[in-house]
Amino acid sequence: MNSRIMILMLTGLLCVPAGAVEIEGVKLADTATVAGRDLVLNGAGLRKRLLFDVYVASLYLPAKISAAAAVLAAEPRRVEIHMLRKVGADDFLEALKNGIEANASQTERDAIQPQMSELAKVITAIGKTKEGDTITVDFVGGSTLVTFNGLEKTRIAGEQFNRALLNAWLGDHPVQSDLKKAMLGG
């Protein structure tokens, strides 16, 4: 093989972004733009339930952060969920509720009940997700923007709701410990 061609091929291989991440066939972008600000991929991991791979979750922040408490102070922030299988709306909502309940007091849960009702309506309207669907949750200016496959579904006001939802993944009792660690870059 011609040495010039070999050099060009090797150079091309070296130009692949070092931060490019692929999990279970899902290629994650190194950056995302939320509210006009560039965010970096902080970390990503695989959500499992029993023996099944359910989704890939990724966290985007203004800068890399490894402490959950510091993530809650960062703004804007994004959680992106790439579905790997069919999941019913009730099952998805139940998992989120369990994550929130495990990390919030009864008083905190009571305070965000109207926002939880709004989220439940949206998830119910989305219905059963399938492999390849993407749910994006942006946290901006005290509100939570939920999109499904690129289409805005709702904007839910309230910083307390915003934090409670993020804590389902990153709180002291996350839905899955190794997913939390992965989203925090570990």
Model-derived regions, located:
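Short strand-turn-strand beta-turns centered on an Asx-Gly dipeptide
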Residues: 148-151
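Flexible glycine-rich active-site/ligand-binding loops centered on an Asp-His dyad
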Residues: 153-179
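Sec/Tat signal peptide C-region and signal peptidase I cleavage site
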Residues: 16-20
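Bacterial N-terminal signal peptides that target proteins for export
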Residues: 1-7
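N-terminal structural module
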Residues: 21-73
